[in-house]
Curated annotation (Swiss-Prot):
Family: Belongs to the FBPase class 3 family.
Compositional bias segments (type: Basic and acidic residues): 298-307
Phylogenetic placement of the source organism: Bacteria, Bacillati, Bacillota, Bacilli, Bacillales
EC number: 3.1.3.11
Keywords: Carbohydrate metabolism, Hydrolase, Manganese
HAMAP family noted in UniProt: FBPase_class3
Listed name of the protein: Fructose-1,6-bisphosphatase class 3
SUPFAM superfamilies: Metallo-dependent phosphatases
Length: 654
């Protein structure tokens, strides 16, 4: 193969570029455009975390931009519209299809409705003009309803200074109404407003878990205009299951059974659980209280006795398969330091006791019917067959493939973005605040380097789905449960103890020291520096651990350098957090933390008017308004400008 020098490579690159910019005028226009964009204010970033499958609450926060939509409406119309009119307009932007139907029922004749159409279209045009004031026209065009771009642009940029086009603009709107296009135009404009108030979305982990509709969240994210994802521990569990880890798959199914969410697997992703049910009904009883499914907060009707019986049996069957599958992984990976989790080998089956962490406990609610005392890791032939079938079904589910591929494409373990560090779980540290080391494949890693190696293995496992017991696949499971995992953030996962030991002291899962050290501003500054970020300007934006505001815990820690935005989207946590989640807004003026109250139903918003569910707290205000030049995107644009200027000097200037 011929070696190409750097000089030759540069020439070839400039040759290719010159085909696109084949005149100095074209090149100059592009440079002028990019240089000008750098001077625009940075767009609004929206941070959400720990969605846990709660689609209804998540999509409401997405539709209202964490209160940003209402704030923009108030800015323009608070002195022009009544409270009811403000509420109706806000609800229309949030849920345009539903609100339109309700509003249309209020009118007695078409004349009144047409007047409302004209007024509402004008209000939405004003709102779009205001929300898009820091965007280029080309960026705004991409946010407009595609089929009505011409009409909307004419209305946005109308200039009637000399009254020459008055009837032209009136005819535009009247024809939209006459041709029965007003509803579709209003719906399109409402979604344009939603899109314009948020430039970019950051999902700081855990789309999946116990909530009922993570698949709908994934579909929403796939269609979102601009976003990134920092994987959470539950997300990686699903990735691991799809990538070939049977122990991840067993964990995932156990959690779904525990929280009565098996319909995610069966109905949403089309996985046949009949073989697992057949196995469960053969070996397990329906009256084991430790394995009865938890009541779902979103389900009003109770499970039938038959449904509860089936789930209880499945729950036991998959839990025992999980504990068996963990044994060979732990034994072939001594560097995981997980010998204490060889739980089935630590059980005394004669006395019905277990000794873990040098303490012996009596066991309750046991279901060891399928365990071979002499070889607890051994799966029954039926268990092996069931897991093989389930893994094949997972890997052949088209919808799951699409969702997991999107998670990989848009996701990462952490993200440095615009001077901040976004990470779901933690950076593993010891009590002294030193980065903890972990050995992988004979080499020791810590800090950012450790997270990079973890991510490499997640991607490798995903690319090599046919390998089910290689190092990369085992490391995906380790990220779910290991003590040096940046996603788990605890010393051990006590799943077995929670099922079978009454003494709650044995259930305790000790957190990584990171979680108390993150209160210390110097520690946070050190972590930012270790990840190559400016500790004077940067912050760590964290999820994973619910903030117990009800007990006085503050999500703003370390003098504002650490922001924790898991406040409890998951209904299961809301009684302990006291709220229904935090989100974060970061625009060119600074940062605002938004605390959300529990979202009950959109019907109340539609019928009774807007009940604002958020309380904003200023985290900081920028001394100087931040421009695109100061962002990651700005650095990318500057790099493009530098190359284009190089081409200009090389080809067109003396």
């Amino acid at each position: 193969m011929t070696q190409i020098t750097e000089r030759e490579l540069k020439k070839k690159y400039l040759d290719l570029l010159s085909q696109r910019f084949d005149t100095p005028e074209k090149l100059a226009t592009e440079i002028i455009n990019l240089e000008s964009i750098l001077e625009l204010p940075k767009g609004t970033e929206h941070f959400v975390s720990d969605l846990h499958g709660e689609y209804e609450a998540f999509q409401h926060v997405l539709r209202n931009g964490s209160g940003n939509v209402r704030a923009k409406i108030n800015d323009i119309f608070k002195d022009k519209l009544s409270t009811k009119e403000l509420n109706d307009l806000t609800a229309l932007v949030y849920y345009p299809e539903d609100k339109l139907q309700l509003i249309k029922c209020d009118f007695q004749n078409y004349g009144q409705l047409n007047v409302w159409y004209i007024t509402t279209i004008e209000h939405l045009i004003q709102l779009i003009k205001y929300c898009s004031s820091k965007y280029t026209r080309s960026k705004l065009r991409r946010a407009l309803p595609e089929q009505y771009v011409f009409i909307v642009e004419e209305l946005l940029y109308k200039n009637n200074e000399f009254k020459n086009k008055k009837s032209y603009y009136e005819t535009l709107v009247n024809q939209v109404i006459e041709l029965k296009q007003a509803d579709d135009l209003i719906i399109g404009l409402a979604y344009s407003v939603q899109r314009l108030v948020v430039d970019h979305l950051h999902v700081v982990g855990d789309i999946y878990d116990r909530g009922p509709q993570p698949d709908k969240i994934m579909d929403t994210l796939i269609n979102y205009h601009s976003l990134d994802i920092q994987w959470g521990n539950h997300d990686v569990l699903w990735v691991g299951a799809y990538a070939g880890s049977k122990v991840c798959l067993a964990n995932l199914l156990r959690i779904c059974a525990r929280y009565d969410n098996l319909d995610i697997v069966e109905d949403a992703y089309g996985i046949n659980l009949r073989p697992l049910l057949t196995l469960a009904e053969k070996y397990y009883d329906a009256d084991n209280p430790a394995f009865k499914p938890k009541k779902r907060p979103d389900k009003h009707e109770r499970l039938t006795q038959r449904e509860e019986s089936q789930i209880t049996k499945i729950h036991q069957a998959i839990a025992m398969i999980q504990f068996k599958l963990e044994i060979p992984v732990i034994k072939r990976r001594p560097n995981f330091e997980m010998d204490e989790r060889l739980v089935l080998e630590k059980v005394n089956y004669d006395t019905n006791e277990i000794t873990v962490y040098r303490k012996t406990y009596p066991l309750k609610d046991t279901c060891f019917q399928t365990v071979n005392r002499d070889n607890p890791a051994e799966l029954l032939p039926e268990e092996e067959e069931v897991m093989n079938k389930l893994l094949l079904s997972f890997q052949q589910s088209e919808k799951l493939r699409r969702h997991m591929s999107f998670l990989m494409r848009k996701g990462s373990l952490y993200l440095p973005c615009n001077g901040n560090l976004l990470i779901h779980g933690c950076i593993p540290v010891d009590e002294n605040g030193e980065m903890e080391s972990f050995e992988i494949d004979g080499q020791t890693y810590s800090g950012q380097e450790l997270l990079d190696v973890f991510e490499y293995h997640v991607r490798k496992s995903f690319d090599e789905k046919e390998n089910t017991d290689d190092l990369s696949t085992d490391l995906v499971w380790y990220l779910w449960t290991g003590k040096y995992s940046s996603l788990f953030g605890k010393r051990a996962m006590t799943t077995f103890e929670r099922y079978f030991i009454a003494d709650k002291a044995s259930h305790k899962e000790e957190k990584n020291p990171y979680y108390h050290l993150r209160e210390d501003v110097n520690m946070v500054r050190k972590m930012l520096s270790d990840f190559g970020l400016n500790p004077d300007e940067g912050r760590i934006i964290n999820g994973h651990t619910p903030v117990k505001e009800i007990n006085g815990e503050d999500p703003i820690k370390a003098d504002g350098k650490m922001l924790v935005i898991d406040g409890g989207f998951s209904k299961a946590y809301q009684s302990t957090t006291g709220i229904a989640g935090y989100t974060l807004l970061y625009n060119s003026f600074g940062m605002q933390l938004v605390a959300h109250q529990q979202f009950n139903a959109k019907e109340k918003i539609l019928s009774e008017g807007i009940e604002e569910l958020s309380i904003k707290r200023i985290v900081d205000k920028e001394l100087q308004r931040k421009k695109i030049r100061n962002t990651n995107k700005g650095k990318e644009l500057q790099a493009q400008i530098d190359i284009l200027k190089m081409l200009m000097h090389d080809r067109y200037l003396d």
